[in-house]
Amino acid sequence: MRKSFEKFLARQEALARQYGEAYEEKQHNRGKLTARERIEFLFDEGTFEEVDAYSPSATTSFGKTVRSYGDGVITGFGNINGRQVFAYSQDFNVQGGSLGSVHAAKIIKVQDMALKTGSPVVGLIDSGGARIQ
């Protein structure tokens, strides 16, 4: 049990490093909110529940392997004006926000969850296109 918890803490730390101050500054210098800031702005305070935050991704781009958690998209659900809504917010700082296999699977998962509950889906797009893997 302790090992599992230590792995979880290591993932939390890696995710926090992935979205550090340099990342925020880069987005703000472009006149953009970060993917997480867009989610926080959209949903009623404290209601957003992220889905698959720790989905691992390892893609090769220009001969370099890029490892990240979440694969450049934040997915989940929460309330907007008290109504349940599902959403995804693409992160341009991870592979240009491009759509890869893990990224697409996360979006499809929240779309399926929304369909089952009769809830709307909001997509916050900040993407350079698709990764053809």
What is the predicted function of each stretch?
Residues 1-133:
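Terminal-region recognition feature
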